[in-house]
């Protein structure tokens, strides 16, 4: 012990001399446990008892230091826990996770285990606090301790102790007594006076607060068997250290000593000081009290001397030694002794068993026991002590129930992802009314899973998007051959006479073909009209497929060069691959047909711009019988051909003829369209040369072309699509709905003929076109072979004045139809029809979408759906070549030979309802952009052309002139 008056050691390493001294006490050993908070580096809470550990002591969690003063009956156990700042700092340094809640509850769980041990092995437990007021969190700790003791410890500890030699000593309560709880506060409030009355008053006030809190939360009860701790009756159990400085600040003391040394008072007092002192009313005025004054109040000195933690503790130790430990603490006492003192040896045996069961086995992961209650204590105690987690989880469960209920109550029978997301957002708001804490994210994830499972349980909508961007409303789990979005549009048929209700299309075929074919059955006009037959895909095998553009384009592009002579040294691999892909290959060694086709192409004086897959060929023989409306006989191969693209009245025409461009350029006028006539003998020679290489039964239009019979074009034909691919069905429609007389410019389009037009927007625009014909030059013109009629036209001139009626029709989803008088203006009756209105219309780009002028809460977009053309009664044919630019694609009719519109007839060209490129759907815009009306698509200007009508008189000579209207 050396200079110290006490012994200290680490449990269980008790020194032999101390063991012999404790053995002399027999059954009069009182064990006092000291636990609580500390701020020192050694985690010492024994400073109030004037005891300290060794200087080399290192604190650790769960470490127990024993203190014993010889001559006393008190064995003090100092518990080092996570409530000590030194131990807590060690745990923080070793912490790797940033989850503070998890760290905090683990630190609290360790403290609860150590305090649980103290309550089972000690007679008196002193809780030390560094604060000046009572820490109410201790009440929570006591609640946890009571829960653990009643729900876990009492279920296994008495039974397992009875299996050892200490079971009879501790009894059914598994502890020597209900320990008396004392509270020691190391610091006294600075603003309180340190007199006996004030200190006692403050201690009594704190005792009342502690007593009421422990009573309120059933920590302290009247029954000794159910009470966790005991409090003495009519005896002080709260101690405030008001006089001693337990943890002095060494630096502050050094600074104070330095100031005292440097400011020594003078030994002699000056005369002036003596004069001032003589004026004092009494001795000691304006001077500090000396030692004599401090010794005057002996009662205060005695109180200060006796008011120590050791004296405070010994009063309770004496109660334990005298057998008054439980008297006054409980109103209900059992007949069996509630308190018993053990010898040092017996207590050490009990301590070893309880320490092993409560502390040691917890850290042993390999420990196995058959006692299920003890196994639950070892594995589940930490979770059961995490009451914050239980609290937050309970709130999250309440919020989860509320959120799920809100979701299910508002959920319809069948709904899609947008509705699901909105319902989930509403359920989240309902959850947040109750859910709180760190487990909100987990609860929200569970809420999302529950709602998703509820949605997928027969309530999920198919949600296959239509070509207009609307989801399918049918149940996903139920088999359905046809999708349906529940949205119905009003649309007209090909001829425009009949309107019907169309469902939102989900395939390109439904949008551009099937609906119009179904409506044509109900339309009296559609079944009678003559239609232009567009080139379509004809399969040669049963397992034909859509073209894969990424893989097929190299072969498709390579196949375009097969008409050119092959380069010497090339292998036959490409030819073999092409033979498999296409059913009708043309070898590169046979260029003769190509040259003859080129000869036919050169016969036109003013060709239109290049269209899909070939040069423009205006030969009337290339159109077949489907376009010879109003003619009684087939086209003669010897007839001349002329063609040109119609230009505006202010734009000069440009001749592209090989032989006569220089001769006719000077003759072109500013306001006329010049057409160069081809001599019949030249055309006849070219036709005969072509017939030598082709079968006699085939015309120019029916010649075999390079088209695939195994792969088809999945989308619409556009300028960049391969010429070898054809679509499965036509997305366009061109029909002659009757003679030109069915349209009256005075009344416009009548409802019985074209239904759904808005008032004033049902007029076609007149278009005056002036044409001048250039006859071929002959060295010896065979005038003797001309008829009289042709000679009269020849003499009267070669000018034509054509009046064409054109209308650009737009149609909205409500079935409203209207014409446009300019790219940015809807036709408003006859007042909007001016002389140059149509010229400005056809020579400018037209927007593909335009706002419908119909009144409604929602603004509907109308789409360019039809072009109305009333052809003139003149010996010319109108040629249509529409090009619709949507995004990066420019869509065309996909015809190698452009269609001719017959004379004096009413023609309607119906545009596709939906545009689709190479496997890329082009959705309509959500709204119209006035600043850029062509952003969503446009019809390019210059879609009309003109060609001379072929004569039906096969007896006429090649040099006979054509019949035409004079200017």
Curated annotation (Swiss-Prot):
UniProt keyword list: Nonsense-mediated mRNA decay
What is the annotated role of this protein in its UniProt record?
A: Involved in nonsense-mediated decay (NMD) of mRNAs containing premature stop codons. Probable component of kinase complex containing nonC and recruited to stalled ribosomes.
Instruction: Please state what the protein is called.
Output: Nonsense-mediated mRNA decay factor SMG8
Top-level taxon: Eukaryota
Please indicate if the UniProt record lists 4Fe-4S as a keyword: no
- Region spans: Disordered: 627-702
Q: Name one Pfam family in it.
A: Smg8_Smg9
Q: Which residues cross the membrane?
A: none
Sorted alphabetically, the Gene Ontology BP terms of this entry are: nuclear-transcribed mRNA catabolic process, nonsense-mediated decay
Per UniProt, the ranges with Low complexity bias are 643-666
Q: Where is the composition biased (Acidic residues)?
A: 628-639
Its family remark reads: Belongs to the SMG8 family.
Composition bias, kind Polar residues: at what positions?
686-702
């Amino acid at each position: 012990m050396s200079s110290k008056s006490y012994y200290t050691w680490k449990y269980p390493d008790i020194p032999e001399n101390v063991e012999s001294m404790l053995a002399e006490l027999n059954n009069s050993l009182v064990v006092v446990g000291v636990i609580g908070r500390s701020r020192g580096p050694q985690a010492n809470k024994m400073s109030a008892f004037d005891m300290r550990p060794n200087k080399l002591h290192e604190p650790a969690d769960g470490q127990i230091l024993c203190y014993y003063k010889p001559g006393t009956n008190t064995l003090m156990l100092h518990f080092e826990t996570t409530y000590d700042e030194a131990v807590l700092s060690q745990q923080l340094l070793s912490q790797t996770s940033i989850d503070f809640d998890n760290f905090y509850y683990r630190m609290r769980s360790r403290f609860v285990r150590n305090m649980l041990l103290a309550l089972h092995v000690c007679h008196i437990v002193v809780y030390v606090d560094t604060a000046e007021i009572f820490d109410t969190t201790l009440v929570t700790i006591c609640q946890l301790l009571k829960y653990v003791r009643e729900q876990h410890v009492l279920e296994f500890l008495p039974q397992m102790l009875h299996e050892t030699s200490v079971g009879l000593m501790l009894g059914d309560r598994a502890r020597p007594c209900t320990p008396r709880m004392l509270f020691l506060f190391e610091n006294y409030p600075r603003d309180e006076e340190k007199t006996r009355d004030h200190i006692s008053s403050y201690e009594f006030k704190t005792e009342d607060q502690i007593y009421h809190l422990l009573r309120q939360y059933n920590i302290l009860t009247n029954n000794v068997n159910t009470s966790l701790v005991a409090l003495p009756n009519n005896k002080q159990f709260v101690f405030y250290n008001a006089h001693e400085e337990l943890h002095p600040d060494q630096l502050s003391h050094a600074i104070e000593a330095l100031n005292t040394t440097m400011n020594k008072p003078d030994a002699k007092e000056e005369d002036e000081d003596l004069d001032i002192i003589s004026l004092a009313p009494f001795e000691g005025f304006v001077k500090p009290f000396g030692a004599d004054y401090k010794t005057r109040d002996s009662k205060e000195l005695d109180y200060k001397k006796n008011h120590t933690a050791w004296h405070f503790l010994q009063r309770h130790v004496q109660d334990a030694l005298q057998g008054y430990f439980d008297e006054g603490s409980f109103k209900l006492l059992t007949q069996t002794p509630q308190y018993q003192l053990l010898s040092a040896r017996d207590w050490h045996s009990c301590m070893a068993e309880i320490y092993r069961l409560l502390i040691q086995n917890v850290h042993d992961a390999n420990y196995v026991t058959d006692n299920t209650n003890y196994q639950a204590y070892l594995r589940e105690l930490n979770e059961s002590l995490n009451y914050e987690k239980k609290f937050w989880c309970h709130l999250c469960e309440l919020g989860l129930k509320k959120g799920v209920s809100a979701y299910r109550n508002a959920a319809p029978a069948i709904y899609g992802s947008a509705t699901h997301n909105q319902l989930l957002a509403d359920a989240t708001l309902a959850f947040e009314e109750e859910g709180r804490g760190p487990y909100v994210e987990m609860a929200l994830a569970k809420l999302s899973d529950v709602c998703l499972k509820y949605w997928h349980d027969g309530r999920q909508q198919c949600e296959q998007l239509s070509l207009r961007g609307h989801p399918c409303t049918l149940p996903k789990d139920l088999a359905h051959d046809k999708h349906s979005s529940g949205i119905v549009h009003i649309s007209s048929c090909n001829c425009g006479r009949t309107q019907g209700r169309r469902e939102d299309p989900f395939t390109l075929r439904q949008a551009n073909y099937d609906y119009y074919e179904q409506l044509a059955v109900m339309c009296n006009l559609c079944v009678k009209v003559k239609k232009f037959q567009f080139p379509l895909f004809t399969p040669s095998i049963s397992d034909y497929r859509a073209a894969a553009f990424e893989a097929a384009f190299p072969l498709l592009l390579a196949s375009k060069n097969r008409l050119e002579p092959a380069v010497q040294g090339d292998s036959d691999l490409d030819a073999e691959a092409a033979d498999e892909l296409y059913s009708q290959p043309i070898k590169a060694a046979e260029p003769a047909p190509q040259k003859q086709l080129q000869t036919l192409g050169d016969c036109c004086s003013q060709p239109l711009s290049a269209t899909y897959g070939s040069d423009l060929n205006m030969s009337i023989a290339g159109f077949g019988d489907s376009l010879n409306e109003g003619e009684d006989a087939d086209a003669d191969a010897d007839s001349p051909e002329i063609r040109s693209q119609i230009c505006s009245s202010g734009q000069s025409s440009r001749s592209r003829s090989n032989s006569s461009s220089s001769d006719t350029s000077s003759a072109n006028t500013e306001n006329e369209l010049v057409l160069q006539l081809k001599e019949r003998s030249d055309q006849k020679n070219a036709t005969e040369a072509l017939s030598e290489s082709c079968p006699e039964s085939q015309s120019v239009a029916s010649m075999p072309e390079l088209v695939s019979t195994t792969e088809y074009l999945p989308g619409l034909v556009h300028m960049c699509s391969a010429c070898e691919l054809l679509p499965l069905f036509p997305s366009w429609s061109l029909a002659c709905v009757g003679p030109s007389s069915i349209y009256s410019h005075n009344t416009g389009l009548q409802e019985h003929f074209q239904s759904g037009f808005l008032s004033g927007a049902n007029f076609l625009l007149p278009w005056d076109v002036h044409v001048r014909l250039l006859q071929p030059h002959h060295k010896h013109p065979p005038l003797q072979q001309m008829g009289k009629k042709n000679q009269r036209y020849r003499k009267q001139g070669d000018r034509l004045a054509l009046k064409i009626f054109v209308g650009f029709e737009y149609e909205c989803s409500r079935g409203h139809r209207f014409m446009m008088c300019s790219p940015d203006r809807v036709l408003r009756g006859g007042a909007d029809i001016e002389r140059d209105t149509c010229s400005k219309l056809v020579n400018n780009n037209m927007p593909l979408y335009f706002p419908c002028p119909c009144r409604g809460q929602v603004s509907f977009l109308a789409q360019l759906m039809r072009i109305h053309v009333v052809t003139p009664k003149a010996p010319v044919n109108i040629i249509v070549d529409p090009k619709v630019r949507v995004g990066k694609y420019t869509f065309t009719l996909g015809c190698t030979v452009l269609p001719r519109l017959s004379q004096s007839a009413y023609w309607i060209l119906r545009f596709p309802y939906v545009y689709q490129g190479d496997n890329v759907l082009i959705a309509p815009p959500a709204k119209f952009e006035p600043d850029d009306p062509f952003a969503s698509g446009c019809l390019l200007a210059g879609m009309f052309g003109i060609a001379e009508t072929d004569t039906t008189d096969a007896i006429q000579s090649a040099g006979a002139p054509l019949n035409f209207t004079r200017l």
